[in-house]
A protein has these predicted regions:
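Conserved redox-cofactor binding core of oxidoreductases
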Residues: 8-97, 102-104, 109, 150-155, ...
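Glycine- and aromatic-enriched mobile tails/lids
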Residues: 6, 10-43, 80-81, 173, ...
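FAD-site-proximal beta/loop scaffold in flavoenzymes
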Residues: 76-100, 247-299
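Conserved FAD-binding subdomain of flavin-dependent enzymes
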Residues: 1-13, 136-144
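An anion/pyrophosphate-binding glycine-rich loop and adjacent beta-alpha core
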Residues: 133, 139-255, 325-331
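Alpha-helix capping and helix-loop boundary segments enriched in small/acidic/polar residues
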Residues: 48, 94, 98, 117-125, ...
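Glycine-rich loop(s) and the adjacent beta-strand/alpha-helix scaffold that form part
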Residues: 105-159, 206, 308-325
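General beta-strand structural signal in soluble alpha/beta enzymes
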Residues: 14-17, 68-71, 100-102, 108-109, ...
């Protein structure tokens, strides 16, 4: 609650109740007493909460006179002989020049990597740059098999329709006009957790109850809410309907499909935002000088499946914690550590490969192949055979990365060069996801594998979950494309431990 009040004091335009308190709406999976009943817990600014928060925090940066390097792209981390991070290499897009930025501390806040999939709610910039930088620097990526599909992406466009739609009372319908979530989740109905709703939608489509000429989408019905409520509480959703689906949601339902939205995995960190690694037999050894916050990090407060609204809380809480710790670290370390002699070697090798290329694969083509492979083999419902095939395909695509060619060798604002450099990040995240997913032979959270599904009352593996063998974090290393594991922390610092149990809705 403290960060919500802090945002409000910064000027965040939260919706208000008649008594002046901050408006809260129901959201998927938000319940009292571990699933007993739904509650109104999500603070909202109409259907633009994230957008409003972005502007509110940016205004605070302007106030603090933060120096932004606009239209620069960070390329690689610089680690010294002891493994400490002492800076980054970066490309200035306006000139095409390569720079070394020496730093006492580097914080990765690069967001998710949803653009490794063909259909994604993520912005085009979300190509996993921070994760790629960490992986190339020898840092493991944690729990990359766990990806959240949002139930309501606009069919054919991927644009997100906020969960606030269903929080305000919108319902999902199949081709029979049936509110089918009542069958799957009698208590929470359309506001069951996202992974569950996405799987139910996928099931309806697979069983022939999808809508449209190809029976390949579900309908989200909002018109019963009334035009006044829609324009007041869901103005952006109305605009999205008109612009991306040619639908007036005050009069007719809008086609939606489950769409990739969020990664639960990322760069492993502790509660201070410090990046941690396995070193000398210690699972969470701190990488000095390196922090990660937000979707690119894996603390892991979301476990295998995030609840709606918790990502913004995550980045606010741990962003603040990281900021405080960085100040302490910098106060204790007055001098910069020297840069190693090979500080820019990895980056120069990547850039020289593009500069010297005369023929080969276009970056856009390779990126498209990566996305198509991930969409096909790491979707809502997974099978062991499909994932194993995906591992082979991604390995073949990785072999093609070295042959990416750059026809336009110009320096100034060369977006083709940026896209080619982004492919290096896409392939790291895609391979981490595919290999980690194929190795986890159970169902847990957002990772549901058809081969391992069991009923909720199964004595050993309820809903396919195998705690004895698989209640552990996955660690994927780029070098050698290898996996390792570390135990889950079952002892929280300030609350009672909550053991895994069967989810009921």
């Amino acid at each position: 609650p403290k960060v919500v009040y802090e945002l409000e004091h910064f000027g965040m335009p939260f919706d208000r109740n008649p008594d002046g308190t901050i408006y809260q709406r129901p959201f998927g999976g938000h319940t009292a007493n571990y699933g007993e009943k739904p509650v109104q817990r999500a603070c909202a600014a109409a259907d633009r909460t994230g957008h409003a928060m972005l502007h509110t925090l940016y205004q605070q940066n302007v106030k603090a006179k933060t120096n932004f390097f606009v239209e620069w792209m960070a390329l690689d981390l610089i680690r010294d002989e002891s493994g400490d991070v002492v800076g980054v290499t970066a490309l200035e897009m306006e000139t095409g020049d390569l720079h070394i930025l020496q730093a006492k501390t580097v914080l990765l806040a690069t967001g998710g990597a949803g653009r490794i999939f063909a259909a994604s709610t993520n912005a085009f910039i979300n190509t996993g740059d921070g994760l790629g930088m960490a992986a190339r620097a020898g840092i493991a990526l944690q729990d990359m098999e766990f990806w959240q599909f949002h139930p309501t992406g606009v069919a054919g466009a991927g644009v997100l329709l906020t969960e606030g739609c269903r929080g305000e009372g919108a319902i999902l319908l199949n081709s029979n006009g049936e509110r089918f979530m009542e069958r799957y989740a009698p208590t929470l109905k359309d506001l069951a957790p996202r992974d569950f709703v996405s799987r139910c939608m996928d099931q309806e489509i697979k069983e022939g109850r999808g809508c449209g000429p190809n029976k390949d989408y579900i309908l989200l019905k909002l018109d019963h809410l009334g035009a006044e409520t829609i324009h007041k509480r869901l103005p952006s959703v109305y605009e999205i309907g008109v612009n991306f689906a040619n639908v007036d949601i005050t009069k007719e339902p809008i086609p939606v499909v489950p769409t990739i939205h969020y990664q639960m995995g990322g760069v492993p960190t502790n509660i201070h935002g410090q990046v941690v690694e396995q070193k000398n037999g210690v699972n969470n050894s701190v990488v000095n000088g390196l922090y990660a916050v937000g979707e690119c990090a894996c603390v892991s407060v979301h476990g295998a499946n995030r609840l709606g609204t918790n990502s913004l809380l995550d980045l606010l809480v741990f962003g603040k914690a990281a900021g405080r710790h960085i100040v302490e670290f910098n106060n204790k370390n007055k001098e910069h550590k020297p840069l190693p002699a090979d500080a820019a070697d990895r980056t120069l090798e990547r850039l020289n490969q593009l500069e010297s290329s005369k023929s080969g694969t276009y970056a856009q083509t390779l990126a498209g192949d990566i996305r198509a492979t991930m969409q096909q083999h790491a979707g809502v419902f997974r099978t062991q055979a499909s994932m194993d095939e995906g591992v082979k395909k991604i390995a073949e695509l990785r072999d093609r990365v070295a042959s990416v060619t750059l026809q336009d060798k110009s320096k100034v604002f060369n977006t083709a060069r940026i896209e080619a450099l982004e492919v290096d990040n896409l392939i790291e995240v895609a391979q981490a996801t595919m290999v980690s997913a194929a190795a986890r032979k159970e169902c847990r959270g957002a990772h549901t594998v058809y081969d391992y599904e069991h009923p909720a009352d199964h004595p050993e593996f309820p809903l396919g979950r195998n705690d004895q063998e698989w209640m552990k974090h996955t660690l994927w290393y780029s070098e050698g494309n290898r996996l390792d594991y570390k135990p889950v922390n079952l002892k929280p610092l300030t609350v009672e431990s909550i053991p895994p149990k069967v989810r009921t809705f």
